[in-house]
Amino acid sequence: MASQDTTASNRPVAPTENVVVDELEGTPHAHCFDEEPMTIRLTLAEGESVPAHQHPDRRIVLHLLSGELSVTLGDDEHAVEAGEVVRFDGNQDVSPTAIEDSVGLLVLAKRTE
């Protein structure tokens, strides 16, 4: 039986996982890991968009790695450029549109409150 790593306080430690974002397969979405928090690479070509949708009970962090997006959140539109990080609530309509070819990393964390 394999032993599980623990911290000094005897809490179990999950194994470290590593992925190369550029090597993930799938567009517009490619899942980085199989467990929480949900982590996804978003790839959109210039002019491509994702239809309005929601991620109920999630807080979302978008780190735009390259390109430029216009992200509609509810009734508001936000310009996001490469290098920027945006955090928003998934309990609203979300629709990103690529102003130019874009790659971003999304982390969808379950709400704790």
Report the location of each language-model feature.
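A cytosolic small-molecule/anion-sensing beta-strand core signal
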Residues: 65-66, 81-82, 100
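A short, N-terminal "cap"/entry segment at the start of jelly-roll beta-barrel domains
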Residues: 1-36, 40
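Ligand-binding loop in jelly-roll beta-barrel domains
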Residues: 90-113
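Glycine- and acidic-residue-biased ligand/ion/polar-headgroup-sensing regions
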Residues: 57-74
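Short acidic-glycine-tyrosine-enriched beta hairpin
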Residues: 74-91
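Conserved short histidine dyad/triad with adjacent acidic residue
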Residues: 25, 38-55
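Histidine-centered metal-chelating micro-motifs
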Residues: 49-51, 86, 90-95
